[in-house]
From Swiss-Prot:
Organism: Thermoanaerobacter pseudethanolicus (strain ATCC 33223 / 39E)
Top-level taxon of the source organism: Bacteria
Entry's family note: Belongs to the prokaryotic/mitochondrial release factor family.
PTM note: Methylated by PrmC. Methylation increases the termination efficiency of RF1.
Chief location category: cytoplasm
Known role: Peptide chain release factor 1 directs the termination of translation in response to the peptide chain termination codons UAG and UAA.
Gene: prfA
Full protein name: Peptide chain release factor 1
C-alpha cells in the first residue's frame, strides 16, 4: 500500500508542476484535465503526508525511551501510545480514500417508485415512500420534481418518477434501490388483519445527452390526449408523449405537463437514464462474473427493507439493522440507515481490494 501511496504522491507533485506551466495553461482543455486529476488525489496525498509525519514523530519519540530521565521517559511512552493510535486511525482513513470512487456519485437522481404486490395497499405504500424521499430531500436541501405519475383514486401511486437534484443525492440514494415491504392493517380491513404489500424503488443517475447518445432512428414517438383519474380528459390537445426505444423495447410515457415539448423532453431524459443504467448493469454483470466466487452473485436481494407498523419497526435486511422509529424514518429521517449502508459498502470494497 505504501508503494501505491508514494506513486500517487509522485503523480500529485508532477501534476502540481503541470498546472503551473504557462504552456499547459494556454491549452484550456488539457489544463482542466490536469486540475481535475490533481483535485481528485489531493485528499489522499495530504492524508499520506500526515501519516509520514506521524511515522517520523514515532521514531523521534522512541529515541527518548532510552533516556535516564524517568519523567521524560514516562512522557515519551504516553506520547508514543497516542502517536500509534493516530497512525492506525490515519491508515484506516487512507484505506477509505483509496476505494475507487463511483463515477456517478456526483450526478443527480431519477427515482422510480412502483406499487408491487398488494393492490391498492401497495399503491398507498408507494405514496408513503414518495413522501419519505421527498421529506429526506428537503432535509438535505435537494430539489424534487415529479416527472411522471400515475395516481389511484384513493391517493396512492401505481407509479411515480422523480427527479432529485442536489449535492450528494445519488451517492446516498443509490442504496435505496430494491424491493421495500410493508406490514400493516389496511384502513379498509374490517377484521384488523395485518397485510403484507411491496413497492419497488429504482434509483438511476441522471445522465446528460453527452453520456448517452440516442439515435433518432431508434425511437418512435407517439402523442395522445392526456387523461385524469378514471380516464377523464384533462386536456383537449394531444400533449401526452409516449417514447419507444425500438432496439431495447423500453417505453416511457409522460403526460404531467400541458406542453407536448416539455413532456417529450422529460420522456427522453428518463429514457437516457434507463439506457445508461442498462449499460452500467451489463458492465457490472461482467465484473461480477469474475468475482462471483468471492462476493456471491451480485444480484440484489428480493427484499431490502421491511416497514412493520404494528411494531413501529424498520429493518434493513442487507445489514441486519433494526430501528424502532418507524414514523421518524417515514418522515424522512433516513441518515442513520444510509450511513450504515455506506459503511457496509466501504467495508465490502476494502475486503476485495488488493492494498499490498
Amino acid at each position: 500500500m505504501i508503494d501505491k501511496l508514494q506513486a500517487i504522491e509522485d503523480r500529485y507533485v508532477d501534476l502540481s508542476q503541470k498546472i503551473s506551466d504557462p504552456n499547459i495553461i494556454s491549452n484550456v482543455a488539457e489544463w482542466r484535465k490536469y486540475v481535475k486529476e490533481h483535485a481528485a488525489i489531493e485528499d489522499i496525498v495530504l492524508k499520506y503526508r500526515e501519516y509520514k509525519k506521524v511515522l517520523e514523530d514515532i521514531e523521534a519519540t522512541k529515541e527518548l525511551l532510552s533516556s535516564n530521565d524517568e519523567e521524560l521517559k514516562e512522557m515519551a511512552e504516553e506520547e508514543l501510545s497516542q502517536l500509534e493510535e493516530k497512525k492506525e486511525k490515519l491508515l484506516e482513513e487512507i484505506k477509505i480514500l483509496l476505494i475507487p470512487k463511483d463515477p456517478n456519485d456526483e450526478k443527480n437522481v431519477i427515482m422510480e417508485i412502483r406499487a408491487g404486490a398488494g393492490g391498492e395497499e401497495a399503491a398507498l405504500f408507494a405514496h408513503d415512500l414518495f413522501r419519505m424521499y421527498s421529506m429526506y430531500a428537503e432535509k438535505k436541501g435537494w430539489k424534487v420534481e415529479i416527472m411522471s405519475s400515475n395516481e389511484t383514486d384513493i391517493g396512492g401511486f401505481k407509479e411515480v418518477i422523480l427527479n432529485i437534484s442536489g449535492k450528494g443525492s445519488y451517492s446516498r440514494l443509490k442504496y435505496e434501490s430494491g424491493v421495500h415491504r410493508v406490514q400493516r392493517v389496511p384502513t379498509t380491513e374490517a377484521g384488523g388483519r395485518i397485510h403484507t404489500s411491496t413497492a419497488t424503488v429504482a434509483v438511476l443517475p441522471e445522465v446528460e445527452e453527452v453520456d448517452v447518445e440516442i439515435n433518432p432512428n431508434d425511437i418512435k414517438i407517439d402523442v395522445f390526449r392526456s387523461g385524469g383519474h378514471g380516464g377523464q380528459s384533462v386536456n383537449t390537445t394531444d400533449s401526452a408523449v409516449r417514447v419507444t426505444h425500438i432496439p431495447t423495447g423500453i417505453v416511457v410515457t409522460c403526460q404531467d405537463e400541458r406542453s407536448q415539448i416539455q413532456n417529450r423532453e422529460r420522456a427522453l431524459k428518463i429514457l437516457r437514464a434507463k439506457l445508461y443504467e442498462m449499460a452500467l448493469q451489463e458492465q457490472q454483470r461482467e465484473i461480477a462474473e469474475t468475482r462471483k466466487s468471492q462476493v456471491g452473485t451480485g444480484e440484489r436481494s428480493e427484499r431490502i427493507r421491511t416497514y412493520n407498523f404494528p411494531q413501529g419497526r424498520v429493518t434493513d435486511h442487507r445489514i441486519g439493522l433494526t430501528l424502532y422509529r418507524l414514523q421518524e424514518v417515514l418522515d424522512g429521517d433516513l441518515d442513520e440507515i444510509i450511513d450504515a449502508l455506506i459503511l457496509n459498502d466501504q467495508a465490502e470494497k476494502l475486503k476485495n481490494m488488493n492494498l499490498n
